[in-house]
A protein has these predicted regions:
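Polytopic transmembrane helical bundles with strong interfacial aromatic enrichment
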Residues: 1-175
Length: 175
């Protein structure tokens, strides 16, 4: 949002690293979805109605939110107002956190199953709210999001230190 050229360079540089990371997440996420059907087909058959709901919500809400607004952020620079361009990356961040939430709802169910009953040889969801408010979600979500923030910070510091020590764009990376 600012007109500071150093911040703009940093945003472009680290934005490219984020795009690479996002692309890797998409690729591994798609492979993971295939694993559910191929490697864990019995689990998917037995728990699919419950386990699939949060993963479907992740794909339909969070992933599309991230993807659309990442595209807006990448291709909207210079075409959108600075406020709208800034808002687009904040919506990517929101979508990433929402994505983490839905994935962790599914994972929390695997760790501590709630809100279901066994009927006709399969697990059937009886309480979606119990699934979403599973006590394990809170701890896993806090751990995952805070770990992601710390990891991102370490990467920014490490890359900046490398660039400083190698004498590349010193004025930009000392900020």
């Amino acid at each position: 949002k600012t007109d500071n050229v150093v911040y703009k360079r940093l945003a472009k540089f680290f934005g490219k690293l984020f795009i690479i990371s996002f692309a890797m997440g998409v690729v591994t996420g798609i492979v993971q979805e295939f694993h559910f059907g191929m490697n864990w087909s019995e689990y998917s058959r037995f728990m699919g109605d419950i386990f699939g709901a949060p993963l479907a919500l992740e794909a339909l809400t969070a992933f599309f939110l991230e993807s659309v607004f990442l595209g807006v952020w990448i291709f909207g620079e210079g075409r959108l107002s600075k406020k709208l361009h800034c808002l687009s990356i904040w919506l990517v961040a929101f979508g990433s956190n929402l994505s983490a939430f839905w994935i962790l709802v599914a994972n929390s169910f695997m760790q501590h199953p709630v809100g279901y009953t066994i009927a006709n040889g399969r697990a059937e969801m009886t309480d979606f709210l119990a699934l979403v408010t599973n006590p394990y979600v809170v701890g896993q979500y806090a751990h995952t999001v805070l770990s992601g923030i710390v990891t991102a910070g370490v990467i920014v510091v490490a890359v900046s230190a490398y660039r400083l020590l190698s004498g590349q764009n010193v004025e930009t990376f000392k900020t």
